[in-house]
């Protein structure tokens, strides 16, 4: 195909048409799909309970099953997670639930690590949540999994 008549300057040729070659489609970058709160919670709970054996963590995930809004758009994430945690662990003494909550907060800020190594996520989440000094029960829970903070 030849250039359209009167088109001397290629800056005015539509993007999909390049007069020097046949039709050329140029790729348009797409933005990644936003990560939802449910996706973050599901990953955090999968990391905290890979065998899916802890009923409290199953209940915690149930608290987020309808949370389909992008995690970056949530203004009160800490409050929402705290309410969900209190709903399954009133005394807030279950280290698995505490680590799941810490992992939710960590992954909400570091969505690029959603598919990272589970041990690394747990270690980094504990460091971020408790500034490297988690409560003894959480430190013991992590040590049982071979994770040092």
Residues of each region from the PLM?
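Acidic, polar-rich N-terminal leader regions of halophilic archaeal proteins
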Residues: 2-149
